[in-house]
Amino acid sequence: MSTGDEPPAEPVVELGPPISEVAWSPELSTQSLEVLILTLEDAEPVWLKPEHADSLRVGLPATARPGDVVLDTLGRYTLTPRVVHSTSWRHEEGRVVLSYIAVVEPPSGLPEDTLARTPVARADLARGDATAPPPEIGVLQVIEHALRHLSWLVQDDPAIGEALPDWRPILERYQPEPFRALG
């Protein structure tokens, strides 16, 4: 029991100076969520892509959880989610883009002038070097990465496997990257 007369104990760890002394400011990166909505039509993956943008981007309020914002976004389009999963991030035009794949039930219809049904094309993965990201990352490359990620999750994560049984034949075509060399 301490009497208060003892000298202060030596610190367990000596902390260095702060990494940054800049509070939030316009010089810091902002973030946005990219919601890549996929569904199945005629046993093939289809991307529900915004008609007037390269991808669906929404803001991320400081108090919100990203997955909840994605679910709210899907609700605005009256889409029924089956799987929502963060898949990647990238730095783009002064902001961090956090990408989520959202697999939804095939919609009977879509609100006019919002989302277009676009067949999913295969793409080479974006490659950087050992200490730097790729110089450019396209949305189709993000979708390719996401589908390879789902290919692994559908086998490894029971919740994903149960949610996407009809996607298994499609996802077999997308070999997870960490395991390509082992095949």
Residue ranges and their predicted role:
Residues S2, S29-R95, T118-A130:
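Conserved Nudix-box catalytic region and its N-terminal flanking loop in Nudix hydrolases
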